[in-house]
Amino acid sequence: MDRSINKAPLRTGAAFSLELDRDLVHVYGEPAFHYFLDIERARFIRSARPCVLLRVDLKDQHGIPARLPQTLSERLFLGIAKSVRDTDFIGWYEDERVAGVVLTEIAEKQPDESIRRTVDRMRRRFETLFPVTVSSRLDIRVNTIRDEGVRN
């Protein structure tokens, strides 16, 4: 898939904004999200620091990421936005299946602790936004991205 922002930056599943406590939350569509992810990856490589990507999806009964209906995805993105800094960016890592958030500022002294707190905050937020039948199936994966690709 060509993810060049010059060719089709915001096509189907494009960027959209959600109102969140009188603030607008910008959510990138898959092509734009990957474009900005590539920029962040290059920036982090130059600075010799890892780029942290959180991927969130809803597992079906077989453990496979399920397609998220619009009502669920909107609440998912609102929950993510309430859990991260406004300098982090969120969007579709994989359209309608996997949400992504890039943590652009990680505490340098204790990066693992900073990431753990963010994930815990996100889980608690999801528990308030969704019934247990949904929140228990939301999977949050932490990935460190380096020049060679995604590392689990």
Question: Which residues fall in each region the model found?
Answer:
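A short glycine-enriched loop-to-beta-strand structural element that forms part of the catalytic core
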Residues: 91-107, 128-152
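Regulatory sensory/coupling modules that transmit signals to nucleotide-handling catalytic cores
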Residues: 1-9, 117-124, 137, 146-148
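Alpha-helical scaffold within the catalytic cores of cyclic-nucleotide enzymes
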Residues: 76-84, 115-130
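Active-site-proximal structural segments of metal-dependent nucleotidyl cyclase/transferase enzymes
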Residues: 36-58, 63-64
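Short helix/loop segment flanking the catalytic signature motif in cyclic-nucleotide metabolism enzymes
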Residues: 63-72, 101-119
